[in-house]
Amino acid sequence: GRQSAALLVVAAEPSGRPWQDRVFDLRVDDHQEPLVELARLLSVARAYHHMNEGDEQVTRGNIDAAVEEYERAETLLPGESEPIFWHAVTLASVGRVDESLPLFAEAFRLRPEWRELVPRLAPAQLLPDDPEMIARIVAAGR
C-alpha cells in the first residue's frame, strides 16, 4: 500500500566528498500518509540546512548573513523554538543583547528548558562570560 516514500537529492556536480553531495536523503518507512510526512520532513531538513549555514556564517564572522539564515529556518519551522534560540544566541554573542531578548523570551515561552542551557553557553564559549548579561537573558520573558 501507500505507507512508504523516499526522496534523494544530490548535487548537480560531484564535489569529491560524497557525504556533502547528498543534499537531502529522506525516507518514510511506515506512515498512513507517507507523502505528507515526507513533505514535513523536507521542511525540517531545509530548516536545519539554513541553521547549519547560519552557523557557518557565524564562524566566518558574517553575522548579518547568519541572522538571515536563522530567519529562513524560523519561517520553515513556525512554532519551533530551536532556530529562534540559536538566532538569539548569535545576536547576544556579538553584543546585540537588546535585540536578542525578545527572541530568547519567545524561545523560552515555546520551550522553557532553553532557559537552563543559557548559563552553560559561556563555558562553551558560545556566549561571553558576563554574568550580568546571562542574568538578563535568563530573565527574558519573565
Model-derived features: where do they sit?
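TPR-adjacent "capping" and linker segments in tetratricopeptide-repeat scaffold/adaptor proteins
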Residues: 7-10, 26-50
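TPR alpha-solenoid repeat register
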Residues: 83, 117-118
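Canonical tetratricopeptide repeat
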Residues: 52, 86, 120-121
